């Protein structure tokens, strides 16, 4: 597929929950949650240094650490919420880092550098933490909560 895309100069939209497979067919990834882009960036940077809790869950699930993703973020991230009941951050009801602000203020798109963006009030702190620790290398949500002022 990559050869065809390169040869013909095409753009490919590959929609999946499997970040691992997306890694092989894309140079840039956009992560959507309930119709909103919550994170985007180069494939390598986004996978290695995720800055949004939902992206972290997807990455942990795709590298065979789905148990850690469930333990880290909880199963509630996949529960349905009525459209008119959404807080300002659509991920807030399932996010272990959510604070009152997440329910009352829509997060801005944060520029993390090198074309990497995330919509989370704590994106900078999360990004710095994942750059230090690395996804799958002992990611500890309790420690991350402390680092973002919880």
Residues covered by each model-derived region:
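P-loop NTP-binding/switch modules centered on Walker-like glycine-rich loops
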Residues: 1-71
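Charged, flexible cofactor/metal-binding loops and thiol motifs
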Residues: 42-149
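Unusually extended, aromatic-enriched hydrophobic runs near protein termini
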Residues: 18-23, 32, 139-142, 147-150
């Amino acid at each position: 597929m990559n050869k065809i895309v390169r040869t013909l100069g095409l753009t490919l939209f590959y929609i999946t929950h499997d970040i691992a497979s997306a890694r092989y067919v894309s140079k840039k990834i956009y992560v959507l949650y309930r119709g909103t882009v919550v994170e985007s960036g180069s494939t390598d940077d986004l996978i290695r240094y995720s800055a949004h809790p939902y992206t972290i869950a997807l990455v942990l699930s795709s590298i065979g650490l789905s148990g850690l993703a469930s333990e880290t973020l909880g199963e509630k991230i996949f529960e349905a919420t009525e459209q008119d009941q959404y807080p300002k951050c659509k991920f807030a009801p399932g996010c272990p880092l959510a604070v009152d602000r997440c329910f009352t203020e829509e997060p801005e798109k944060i520029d993390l550098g090198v074309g990497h963006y995330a919509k989370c009030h704590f994106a900078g702190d999360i990004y710095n933490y994942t750059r230090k620790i690395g996804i799958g290398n002992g990611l500890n949500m309790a420690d991350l909560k402390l680092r973002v002022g919880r």
